[in-house]
């Protein structure tokens, strides 16, 4: 039960970071923090119920998150090269 509370706290910290911060890299790190909190909850629930499904789901979420990191950082770097800023407000550059 303690791990589920910890996962909820970590998820809340990540959600607050996404809502409050304007820097794209910080927002990206907060989204990754939220994904890791979900992984912790999956593993904690799997441990409580004696199954392995939560661990398998957590593994697949980590694989997808690794691909997300590659694509997300490439987009952030392209915005930074164009504007010399990593602000979320500069993300509308990609529309043109």
From Swiss-Prot:
EC number(s) reported in the record: 7.1.1.-
Keyword rRNA-binding: no
Major location category of this protein: membrane
GO biological process, one term: ATP synthesis coupled electron transport
Cited Pfam families: Oxidored_q2 (PF00420)
Keyword annotations of the record: Cell membrane, Membrane, NAD, Quinone, Translocase, Transmembrane, Transmembrane helix, Transport
A GO CC term assigned to this protein in UniProt: NADH dehydrogenase complex
Membership in a protein family: Belongs to the complex I subunit 4L family.
NCBIfam families in alphabetical order: PRK05715.1-2 (NF004320)
Quaternary assembly: NDH-1 is composed of 14 different subunits. Subunits NuoA, H, J, K, L, M, N constitute the membrane sector of the complex.
Annotated HAMAP family: NDH1_NuoK
Designated name of the protein: NADH-quinone oxidoreductase subunit K
Gene, per the UniProt record: nuoK
